[in-house]
């Protein structure tokens, strides 16, 4: 665990024009799962009552935690999306993350709370993560999947430079991909 925490200190906060993407630490993931309010302190951000997004189930947190401890090279692949206001106060608006699929391919997922959707935050956060991942040693492509009926999610992938790559893993899903 000590090595994991040392590695996290070297993971930079990703910054976009409007957002800050903070690497998820084991402590943050535990606080998030506990739903007791400690996440606000750890992120130094307001956590809306609507947190977490519908897709953000406890087994997802457990998987991210296990992945981070088993594969320290993936530190920084999972991030909370924070939006600072004009005074620098931050609000948690979503999350983005990536899982190695093997052979240099990382699959990303992203979610934005409903109150912050349709403002470009998901695209901005996913785009920053895609760029970050493609700079990492050993990563040759980034993919994402969604249901074919989810036009907004497909737009996010396309705006991140991904192109249609065929059917996804589950029935009714499609996969998009961006090569290095």
Segments and roles (model prediction):
Residues 119, 123, 149-166:
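Conserved active-site alpha-helix within GNAT-family acetyltransferase domains
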Residues 1-107, 111-115, 128-136, 145-149, ...:
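GNAT-family acyltransferases
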């Amino acid at each position: 665990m000590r090595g994991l925490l040392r590695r996290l200190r070297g993971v930079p906060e990703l910054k976009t024009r409007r957002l800050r993407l903070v690497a998820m630490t084991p402590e943050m993931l535990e606080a998030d799962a506990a739903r007791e309010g400690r996440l606000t302190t750890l992120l130094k951000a307001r956590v809306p009552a609507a947190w977490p997004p519908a897709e953000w189930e406890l087994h997802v947190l457990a998987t991210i935690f296990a992945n981070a401890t088993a594969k320290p090279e993936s530190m920084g692949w999972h991030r909370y999306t924070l939006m600072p206001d004009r005074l620098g106060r931050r609000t948690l608006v979503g999350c983005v993350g990536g899982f190695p699929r093997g052979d240099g391919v990382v699959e990303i997922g992203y979610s934005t709370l409903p109150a912050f959707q349709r403002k470009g935050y998901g695209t901005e956060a996913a785009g920053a993560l895609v760029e970050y991942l493609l700079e990492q040693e050993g990563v040759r492509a980034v993919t994402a999947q969604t249901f074919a009926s989810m036009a907004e999610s497909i737009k996010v992938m396309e705006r991140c430079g991904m192109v249609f790559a065929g059917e996804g893993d589950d029935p009714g899903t499609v996969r998009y991909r961006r090569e290095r």
